[in-house]
Amino acid sequence: MALWDRIKESASTMQTQLMARKNDLKSGAFRDASMAMCALVAAADGNIDPSERQKVAQLIMNNEVLQNFPAQDLQRRFDDNCNKLTADFDFGKVSVLQEVAKAKKKPAEARAVIQIGIIIGGADGDFDKDEQAVVREACFALDLPPHEFDL
């Protein structure tokens, strides 16, 4: 099986798992951590071009699990995290990873945040090494073993 086929299959499986837990994923910590994860993936290579930012924002709005939250609230949180990362990537990354870590107390939410990162990262057909690296860092911030997600 080609790498892209495995990524698509994995993302599809993860989306199904997220949908099964949709009603459990309504906390503010999950919301904040998810938007931080989306920003990290968007900025994985150290910058975010406007088209990439728009594409990730569109994916956020279309994700059924994230529809538990007001779209404007998600957009604002995503933009705030993106702005931190574009102002100073290294310093911003520390702050954004702290947002991700908010989901650490609830393992199901922590896993869901990682799954969202993988889904967003693989949505363009290429879950590249930079995206994998930031999702792996998020695993450490959430006290989850990266190998659980094939990272």
Predicted regions: what they are:
Residues 1-40, 50-151:
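Small-residue-enriched hydrophobic alpha-helices in membranes
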